[in-house]
């Protein structure tokens, strides 16, 4: 009987001690996760009871080593410095709560990796920098900062040995352009994309990787016209060139013409000395012509009597012999055939001008004609 009572009391004491120990035990952190990007890796967790005397400690373990962090009161911690060979390893993260001298059990582990071929809960990817788009020669020019320079201090690019390989897909994957960007050669990565047709908006998708580290796809669009238009200067410069050439040639021709004309003026007089000799009539000033009337002396003078009636009465009484004498005297004064000759000469020359003498006149050197007019003094 006493033995049974002793056993019952012992079991009761043990149960009480167990309940006291469970009440004193520190609870473990919950919902452990990892957030990783191009700049680093951060572990996060949750804790049901937050006290000022509670600290947390993060443990990172890879396939070869295990590292513990310093204690922190925050519910997150940057663990980038605790990663070794992030390009190939995968990491297991656990968090332990510490209060006083007591530690909680480790939390559930969380596995992550930057290696796209590793088996992990989460695979960390890199992000492309901001992309600059501009039209160039009828194509869409794509340019962005080289990630090998931009992320050179991040854990993802630690112990780097590979180059960046990226591809641009257009027209819903129908066209694809791939390029390589190196750290030593390029401060920026750039290429040109060709589109099958012209449109108001040009979109494409950018993907890439550095070894086994992959980049998150990035989509970009350019709104505008990328077609190439010939600048105005392409037509202006040839036209100016042709115009200046023609002006230059024209100037040379004018100078040569002036020179030839001056030389010809010097040589022609010596080659043709009498070419410009038009005779004395052309070399002297014209003379003034003076008209001199011929003196005509009357051979017969008739005196009027005082009474015309008396004179007329005397005429019929005059003797015919006297009239014949007068007629013969007047006829003898002109000569026997003077009137006949003058009349015949005038008719033969088709010009009835007995009062204008006929003379020779020189119209040009060596060319003389018959003319009628006053005599030259």
UniProtKB/Swiss-Prot annotation:
It comes from the Eukaryota. Keywords: Cell membrane, Glycoprotein, Membrane, Receptor, Signal, Transmembrane, Transmembrane helix. The gene is ifngr1. It comes from Carassius auratus. InterPro entries: FN3_dom, FN3_sf, Ig-like_fold, Type-II_Cytokine-TF_Rcpt. Belongs to the type II cytokine receptor family. Residues 326-377 are annotated as: Disordered. Highly expressed in spleen. Also detected in brain, kidney, gill, intestine and heart. Expressed at very low levels in muscle. In immune cell populations, shows highest expression in monocytes, and slightly lower expression in peripheral blood leukocytes, splenocytes, neutrophils and mature macrophages. Residues 257-377 are cytoplasmic. Its main location: membrane. Residues 24-235 are extracellular. Residues 1-23 form the signal peptide. It is found in: Cell membrane. The chain crosses the membrane at residues 236-256. One of its GO terms (cellular component) is plasma membrane. Glycans are attached at residues 78, 186. This is Interferon gamma receptor 1. It is a single-pass type I membrane protein. PANTHER family: CYTOKINE RECEPTOR FAMILY MEMBER B13-RELATED, INTERFERON/INTERLEUKIN RECEPTOR. Receptor which shows binding specificity for the cytokine ifng1r (interferon gamma-related).
